[in-house]
Amino acid sequence: MLLLASASPARRRLLEQAQIPHQVMVSGVDEDQIHHPDPAQLVQLLAEAKASAVKLKVEQSAELNVSIKAVLGCDSVLAFEGEVFGKPVDAAEAVARWQRMRGKWAELHTGHCLIPPSFAPTTEGRAPEMQCTCVTTRVLFANLTDVEVEDYVASGEPLQCAGGFALEGRGGCCVEQLAGCYSNVIGLSLPLLRRWLSLS
């Protein structure tokens, strides 16, 4: 059983579609307290903080679920022209970002951290090890008109997503091309997770 340290519905849907048994426990980590100038490093730090916080909650729980194989923390940001874009704070910011990004490439970074709890079974006498990395996918945005930008932002979808778009939703119509892992843009890299789980 995988424990997802995230409140993201998109990440949960990915796990459900991949038929990976899981539960969800929100970390409660204050993301505003974690900083790093490199977006790839930033998302790794955030993912590790979330996974570590949930691991601690699980280990201190009176109702310990020994079926939990590992805790997975994830966090995503969009890097565009040297700036890091998380979720837009409001519609005006989302519109301004889209007007800058349209017709251009950006990088979607997702940090992943997999931590086996201390009670997880060891393999060949070795203690379970934490694994953390960042997966990056390049995204080419469609050259939307102002009307198309405003219409998409008015749907409310961009306000819920890192970078201001949801590839699995209406935002999929606003992306021309991807270079890299598709599921990574939605919230986590399923190929990476498959490799990690096969080794744990």
UniProtKB/Swiss-Prot annotation:
SUPFAM superfamilies: ITPase-like. Its main location: cytoplasm. It is found in: Cytoplasm. It catalyses: a ribonucleoside 5'-triphosphate + H2O = a ribonucleoside 5'-phosphate + diphosphate + H(+); a 2'-deoxyribonucleoside 5'-triphosphate + H2O = a 2'-deoxyribonucleoside 5'-phosphate + diphosphate + H(+). One of its GO terms (molecular function) is nucleoside triphosphate diphosphatase activity. Its cofactor is a divalent metal cation. The keyword rRNA processing does not apply. The keyword Hydrolase applies. One of its GO terms (biological process) is nucleotide metabolic process. The active site is at D75. GO terms for cellular component: cytoplasm. PANTHER family: BIFUNCTIONAL DTTP/UTP PYROPHOSPHATASE/METHYLTRANSFERASE PROTEIN-RELATED, BIFUNCTIONAL DTTP_UTP PYROPHOSPHATASE_METHYLTRANSFERASE PROTEIN-RELATED. HAMAP family: Maf. Belongs to the Maf family. This is Nucleoside triphosphate pyrophosphatase. It comes from Synechococcus sp. (strain CC9311). The lineage of its organism: Bacteria, Bacillati, Cyanobacteriota, Cyanophyceae, Synechococcales.
